[in-house]
Each structure stands twice: as structure tokens, then as C-alpha cells.
Amino acid sequence: MSKSIPELYGSLVFNDSEMKARLPKDIYKALAKTINSGSHLELDVANSVAVAMKEWALEHGATHFTHWFQPMTGITAEKHDSFLSPTGVGEAIMEFSGKELVKGEPDASSFPSGGLRATFEARGYTAWDPTSFAFIKGHTLCIPTAFCSYSGEALDKKTPLLRSMEAVSKEATHLLHILGKTDVKRVNTTVGAEQEYFLVDKECYRLRKDLIFCRRTLFGAPAPKGQEMDDHYFGSIKPRVEAFMEELNEELWKLGIPAKTEHNEVAPAQHELAPVFETVNVAVDHNQLVMEMMKKVADRHDLACLLHEKPFEGINGSGKHNNWALSTDTGENLLNPGKTPAENTQFLLFLAAVVEAVDDYADLLRISVATAGNDHRLGANEAPPAVVSLFLGEELEAVVDSIKSEIYFEGKGAVQMSIGPKVLPHFTKDNTDRNRTSPFAFTGNKFEFRMPGSSLSLSGPNVILNTAVAESLAGFCKVLDGLTGSELDLAIHKLLKDTFTDHARIIFNGNGYTDEWLAEAKKRGLPNLKSTPEALPHLIAEKNIELFTKHHVLTKEELFSRYEILLEDYAKTIHIEAKTMEEMVQKDFLPSLFSYVNDLACTGSTKKELVPGITTKAEEKLITKLSGLADTISDELDILKDMIGTAEGMDDYLKAGTYYHDTILAEMETIRLAVNDAEVLIPEDYLPYPTYDALLFYI
């Protein structure tokens, strides 16, 4: 690394310090006002910003610019335009206008719209999000933007997120003003995204069609060793992986992404990266860049980065923990309980709002993480169950119980930890333990939403959280508005008691992996939406439509479009997996099996010719076993082909998605098990693809 980290950090970002240095004072102030308060950006300001941004980009080797946006595909999109502008006399100049900065016009017809746009209705618009800084990637200036249709409907992940940020800020600020904090002008959602991923050798990756097409293995007998020794988690990082991590950090730091923590995860070949908290729209943008850079840097190290939620059967899959908090523009974390949480009225109000929101909109939180990949992970004793519950920890649950019962809470105070040997330091014990089985856990000064899958855009979960909490806060403001003094105190006390009493069912501090909890959750009336097709219809329930439209986050039409897009994506994902399985079995695995059986038969015949009367029992036993498995695989493959044909004839995506989940996935599992049984009997040099041994342990 030629530069120090402070010199490197943000060097490819047109950030606040660059703007301050390059823009005239009046222009900088106008832009800062837009960024901080959301005021309208005048064209003359945009023109000045565009000129400064272009000059900065050219100095860093950029030749093109792009409006970088996040359509409903869940990944980013970009179209590159050069700064070049011919003069008409055989020469060219480099130009970039305020209009080009503020607005773009990509073709909207080729992106998912869920029926909002017909194919012939091609015009769409991208609009600059000045709260997320422009950056340089390669030779291209990337300008973060929102994406909408010609008629103004949101066609992306960013627009509803920005709307939800405004909604929760409005209601949280209102509540703080009621409490007397009138200096607060804005409340920001902050997020830290813990990104899990796998690294495998690139050559092994290229030999697996399932990894290429499906991002997960469709077959694979378990390696002799998995994760049962607990020796990979936080273990020593292998040199090849360490080199990848070092370069990844450098690339992320250049882009102003505050990558902080890196370590081995539980499963072999699994790792994690975690950044410092940022404002949610910036955190979501940065997480998209993190995933992109992971793949690019891995490729340069002859590795492949797998972001699927369950790339390997029999070991842990990958998630993306969404650490969520609320902070004021004056620098206060509203989820910080302080030293005496029982006496912290402000904290208790915001805690109650989150508890109510999670209970009332648990179905939406489940939907926000519903994908074909994540269905393999949730509820599998490696990730939270599909039932949404909320963990508070021992002390906070006791505080809540005291409010409900109106019994004075006597805190234990700070507890000093002493491990034993005098040489080891004493330190203060945290108020809450960590519950890794909880979908939604309070972890000291934030909530950790643990259900999102590793490949997911975090826009969806945070849109739900922001909007649901905004609804709770709006209800609180309605009750408390206009009250002062003792009247306000009494109203707050009653509000807290009623809220914690009415929503007590969502609070659970125990082991979420047990069958006993699932039975208890059912008794409490908590939804258990086990699969994506089961969950998605709840998105368009009347109460949820009302929530989004009331807070101007999504229109009814935009909500229905997302319902259609998510269903279609689910069905198409399983369809691709089924077709890939069909091809791998038909063209690759069965021919390899037949080749080995043929060689076994030849070996047996040769032995008998060379040594008359010699036994060939071992060969015959293996041939019989493999031939039986081949028949099973072939028969089941015929069944799968018929099922695929049936699904292809369905024009209702909910019906198709349900069929893929209930019928086709079950048949694919039958084939997987038969192939795995055969795989362990066949030498590796006959197999058409690398085994789990090579994929997980040969880096």
C-alpha cells in the first residue's frame, strides 16, 4: 500500500471536503442545504457542481460518467457516456452539464416493472441523489441516482428507501419536539451491514455449472470434515484469503467505504466483512459496492466469491445482519438506553415504537428477506427461524415488565467482570447478552435484524423498518401532541404501559431454534411464513397497502408491481436451478457414472481372464449399487422434466411459485440425494465437477 490509510480513504470520492475546496462558497452552501434539508437544487447550482465534479474526475483519469442506480433486479445498473464532445473542426472538448448531472434517461422497458410499464413504454428517468457522494470506478464517474418511469412510478430500490427515511425522520422529529428537543431538525436511520461470503478456487468454480448458473451447488456429498470442530470461526486467515482481504480493503477505502472488521466465519471457506455505521441510503449504496468489489477482487486472486445464501448443503449458509439505529442531526443515538434505561423516557418511547412496529408488521419484515436462496437458510439451526420475534435481553425485559406491572424497577447497576487471574483486566459487563437465534435483537444501542440473506439489497428491509416505525411514532405523536408537564408525563406512562402490554407477544429472549418456541409462537399468534410463496401475498394485504400509502413510501400500484416482480423472480430462480440440474445430470453426471461402471466391468472381466476362478465380488457389488442408483436418478430425472414442463405452462406466478416450492424443489432434493450417494462411490478423476473437499478446503 503506497499511501497511508487516511490518504487512501475516500480518494476516489467527490466528498464534502472536495466540494468545499472546489466549489464557490455560495454554491457549496446551496448544495449543503439540499443535502442536509432536502431543499430544491437550482440548475445554476447543478451546473457549477457538474463542472467541478468533471474536473475532479478528469484529474483521476475518468473518461466517462454514468447514472448509477439500483433497479428491481437487486443489483446495480449503469450506462456509460463519455465526457467527449466534438467541436466540429476535428477536435473535441470534455463537457458535463448540470442537466446531465441531475437527470438521465435510460430505457425503462428492459428492467423489471411488475406491470407498471409496457415494453413499448421505454422512457425512464434517473435523478441524482446528492446525499450519496459520486465516486470513480475504473475510468467512470458514478453518480448515485434514483430510477423512475416516465409517469413517475418508482422502478428501483433507492426511491422508496429515501421516502421511508423522510417518513421516519418526520415522525421521530415530531416526537422529540413534543419532548422538548426543538433543536432537532432531522432524524437519520443509520445502518451497519455485516456481509458474509464464501471464497472458492476459480478453476473449481468454472467446472461447476450449478455455481455458474445458480450460484449454489445442486449436488455434493459432504466432505469428511465440515464445521463440527468449530475451528474455522475466528481462526487464522489463510495467506491467499488474507491477500484478497488486503486488496479488498484498499479498494473499499478508496471508495470511502469504512470497512472495519474481517474474520473467518463458522463454515469452511466462509468469511465476513463489517463496516462502520452510515446513514442508511449510503450504507445500502456501499453494500452494493462491497458485493461488486468482492467479486472483482476475488477474480484477480484466482478466486470466486459466492454470495448465495446457501451455496453448500450441510454447512452454514451466509447472511447479512442489518444493524439499525436512529440518530438525530445533533448527534444523539435515540436507541442508547443510557446508564438507567428505566428512567430514560425518550429511549423507552423509541423502544416501544420499535416493539409495536415489529409486532404489527412482522409479516412485512419476513417478506423483506423472502428469496429462493434465503428460504434454504431460515429456520435451519444456522439462522433465525421464519417466525419474527424480538430479543431485548434480561435487563430491558425486566424494565418492560416493571412498566407493565407498575412495579418499581431496581437496576443492578454496572457489574464488573473478573475472569480470575490478576494479570487480566477487569471490565464492565454489558447489560444484554447476544442471542444469535433471534431474528430481531437489541444489542446495546441498536437493533440487529439477522434474517436478511447475503445477496440481498438491504433497501427492502430498511424500507419496512423505517415505515413501520414511522407509523408507530405517528400514533404516539397523536396521543401526546399538545400535552405538557404532568399531563404529558402521565400520558407517556400510560402509552408505554399499553404498548408493551399489547405487544408483549413479540418479545422472546429464549432459543429460537427449538420446536418448543415454534409451538409457543403459534400459541401467541405470531405468523410463521415458511417460504417465499407463502409470505409474498401478505405484501398486498390491506393493512400493508394502507401503511405504505399513508406515509407516501409506495403507492398501491408500486406495491403490486413489487409483489409481481418478487413472485416472478422466485419462480424463475427455481426454474433455472431445475433446468441446470437436468443438464448436469443428463450430460455430465450419468455419463461419468456409466464410464466408471464400464471400466469396473472391464476390470472384472480382465481379472477373470488373467486368473480363472478369481472372485470379482467387490466389482460386482459396486456395479450393482451404481447401476441401481443410475436407474433411480434416470427415473427421477424423467419425473423432474415432466414437472418443469407443467410449471412452464403456468401463467400465474403465485401458482407457479407454489408449485416450484412444494413439488419441484422436493423432487430436486430426491435427485440430489441419489447423486450424492453415487458420488461417494466414484473416483474423483471420473467425476465431471470438483467435490466439496476441493471447493471448501483447497485454498
Positions of PLM-derived features:
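Short linear, low-complexity motifs centered on an aromatic residue
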Residues: 74-89, 109, 208-210, 215-217, ...
